[in-house]
From Swiss-Prot:
Stress conditions rapidly and substantially elevates the amount of SUMO1 and SUMO2 conjugates with a concomitant reduction in the amount of free SUMO proteins. The SUMO conjugation system plays an important function in stress protection and/or repair. Pfam families: Rad60-SLD. One of its GO terms (molecular function) is protein tag activity. Interacts with SAE2, SCE1, SIZ1 and MMS21. Covalently attached to a number of proteins. Interacts with NPR1; this interaction promotes NPR1 phosphorylation and triggers its sumoylation and subsequent degradation. This is Small ubiquitin-related modifier 3. GO terms for cellular component: cytoplasm; nucleus. It comes from Arabidopsis thaliana (Mouse-ear cress). One of its GO terms (biological process) is protein sumoylation. Keywords: Cytoplasm, Isopeptide bond, Nucleus, Ubl conjugation pathway. There is a cross-link at G93 (Glycyl lysine isopeptide (Gly-Lys) (interchain with K-? in acceptor proteins)).
């Protein structure tokens, strides 16, 4: 017969971790087991290392907000099976209200 005390540490260990899925734009999915109290920065570094890219090459998005890396799964209310989207980071561009000035100041047809 099993002792109820033997089951308790296993449950506490399972509750201390969360299994997260990182999904790329091309559909690749990688599962990570992360402590609920540990910052997500390590998960982000490992994901980028496996892809052979630097951390700043990706933007990690959860529930529509970018993850900076210092947040923990507890702070973001993450549960088992939650998905973090890994999007290739883009730089540059203009806000919509700046585009009109760009066309007024520069001759884009002469390029």
């Amino acid at each position: 017969m099993s002792n109820p005390q033997d089951d308790k540490p296993i449950d506490q260990e399972q509750e201390a971790h969360v299994i997260l899925k990182v999904k790329s734009q091309d559909g690749d999915e990688v599962l990570f087991k992360n402590k609920k109290s540990a910052p997500l920065k390590k998960l982000m570094y490992v994901y980028c290392d496996r892809r052979g890219l630097k951390l700043d090459a990706f933007a990690f998005i959860f529930n529509g907000a970018r993850i900076g890396g210092l947040e923990t799964p507890d702070e973001l209310d993450m549960e088992d099976g939650d998905v973090i989207d890994a999007c290739r980071a883009m730089s540059g561009g203009l806000r919509a209200n700046q585009r009109q000035w760009s066309y007024m100041l520069f001759d884009h047809n002469g390029l």
